[in-house]
Amino acid sequence: MEKRIFTVAKIEGEYAYLKENDSSEELFIALALLPFGVDVGSVLEYENFEFTLA
């Protein structure tokens, strides 16, 4: 599986909106599935079904 890069666009309650850097795709995902310390503007790598801070 290829690595994808996302930026946290906004956080509303317990959910985050992630914008993929290489396209206009946007994800709506629960904060519980993201690494501790994620905030608006954080850059995340998604690989092997796991998000990590870049």
Where do the model's predicted regions map?
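Short, Lys/Arg- and Gly-enriched loop/turn segments at beta-strand edges
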Residues: 49-54
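Glycine-centered tight beta-turn/hairpin loop motif at sheet-sheet or coil-to-beta transitions
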Residues: 1, 22-24
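Short aromatic-glycine-enriched beta-strand elements
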Residues: 14-18
